[in-house]
């Protein structure tokens, strides 16, 4: 028994086989962790969107307290932000899917 076997350094063919097996075997814990991270990122993105919308729209639209024109301005600003967010999200998802399909990711 050599030192390489003690420290996990078996033959190169054994290392390749172990690495290939590890990559191809689906790990339910890893999958669950990826799902949890994806959910947390989605919540963080939604929170960031709400914060930016609130900050920008209210700063732009609230010129005087309780003015009726504030409501229309805020509604239009929110709609604009949501349309922009949807366009950007679709483009981002498309790029990620294309990169994943071509093996870049």
Swiss-Prot record:
Xref: InterPro entries: Tim10-like, Tim10-like_dom_sf
Disulphide bridges, residue numbers: 57-77, 61-73
GO terms (BP aspect): protein insertion into mitochondrial inner membrane
Lipid bilayer topology: Peripheral membrane protein
Region (Disordered): 1-27
Main location: mitochondrion
Subcellular location: Mitochondrion inner membrane; Mitochondrion intermembrane space
Outcome following mutation: residue 73 to S: Abolishes import into mitochondrion
Subunit record text: Heterohexamer; composed of 3 copies of TIM8 and 3 copies of TIM13, named soluble 70 kDa complex. Associates with the TIM22 complex, whose core is composed of TIM18, TIM22 and TIM54. Interacts with the transmembrane regions of multi-pass transmembrane proteins in transit.
Family: Belongs to the small Tim family.
Protein name according to UniProt: Mitochondrial import inner membrane translocase subunit TIM13
UniProt organism field: Saccharomyces cerevisiae (strain ATCC 204508 / S288c) (Baker's yeast)
Organism phylogeny: Eukaryota, Fungi, Dikarya, Ascomycota, Saccharomycotina
Gene, per the UniProt record: TIM13
């Amino acid at each position: 028994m050599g030192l390489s076997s003690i420290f996990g350094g078996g033959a190169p063919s054994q290392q390749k086989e172990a690495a290939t097996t590890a990559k191809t075997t689906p790990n339910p814990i890893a999958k669950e962790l990826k799902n949890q991270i994806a959910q947390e990122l989605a919540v963080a993105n939604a929170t960031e969107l709400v914060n930016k919308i609130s900050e920008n729209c209210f700063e732009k639209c609230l010129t005087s307290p309780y003015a009726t024109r504030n409501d229309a301005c805020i509604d239009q600003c929110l709609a604009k932000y949501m349309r922009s967010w949807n366009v950007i999200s679709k483009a981002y998802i498309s790029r990620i899917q294309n990169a994943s399909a071509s093996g870049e990711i």
